[in-house]
Amino acid sequence: MTGMESGENLENMEDILARHRKENKDLQNKITGMKKQATKSKRKEVNSKCLDLQDKLKTKQENEIRDWKIANNEVFDAEQEDEVTPEKLLEQLSISRDEKEQQNVPVQQQQQGQTKKRRNRQKERLAKRDAAIAKMKEEAALEASKQPDLKKMEQESIDQLCELKKLKQFDIQPDGHCLFASILDQLKLRHDPKKLDQDMDVMKLRWLSCNYVQEHRDDFIPYLFDEETMKMKDIDEYTKEMEHTAQWGGEIEILALSHVFDCPISILMSGRPIQVYNECGKNPELKLVYYKHSYALGEHYNSLHDS
């Protein structure tokens, strides 16, 4: 049984809202620190990162509240028990009439009848609550079915951007190495092959990016904020995992490799302007495309070739 299904493991709404207030306060403190530490050249990237962190936290908190309302069996009790409805008024009138009719009935029989009515009313309340929960789940499922096809919308938007920029998407295997494989493909395509190490591969690119991060720690502090724990990541643990595993690469690795190869790296994506890292790089620009919704495994990078 999951935490959402088990009443014992559920937070109450007061706990959730208190946690959300703390998360918002912690994030605001981190954002303030990130902006103070950002250099002038990194200010635009840091501001974009801060907005992204705020959007993700807001969405996460809204989803938690919605899920709690759907799954928590107590959500209807306090609100609906105190609500005066026509049905409850009729029920009360019926109870009063029955009590008058039973005035001449032996006390024992009256008590048995009242106990039975109390049990029936409890059963009715439980039935109403279960019906309300079922209705909420149906409405949530209906709402989900009305959501737009994000994968289709994203792909159509990227196709249009590529056509406008005279680029075509070159498929890279969707795994944890996709960013590095895309950059490797771009290096072979757009840089002088004579200057590229013959043994260059995704693992070598991982090592190069991690080595650069270690040598320029202060430049990467704004990017090391963990959205799940709301704390800064340990840079040594981060680079160790990134170098030796198939961990997905992202902004940190793109920025690092743009400096390693002294070239701009541009990221085309749906719904946002093209993001360019190290715009002042002297070597030819490397061009990638980023997908958020199009692949089952999650976020993905492909290489962009000229059409």
Swiss-Prot record:
PROSITE patterns in alphabetical order: OTU
Bias (Low complexity): 103-114
Highest taxon listed in the record's lineage: Eukaryota
Species this protein is from: Saccharomyces cerevisiae (strain ATCC 204508 / S288c)
UniProt name for this protein: OTU domain-containing protein 2
General remark: Present with 172 molecules/cell in log phase SD medium.
Cellular component terms (Gene Ontology): cytoplasm
Lineage per the UniProt record: Eukaryota, Fungi, Dikarya, Ascomycota, Saccharomycotina
All copies of domain OTU, residue ranges: 167-307
Gene3D superfamilies according to UniProt: 3.90.70.80
Stretches for region Disordered: 23-46, 96-130
Family matches, as Pfam families: OTU (PF02338)
GO molecular function, one term: cysteine-type deubiquitinase activity
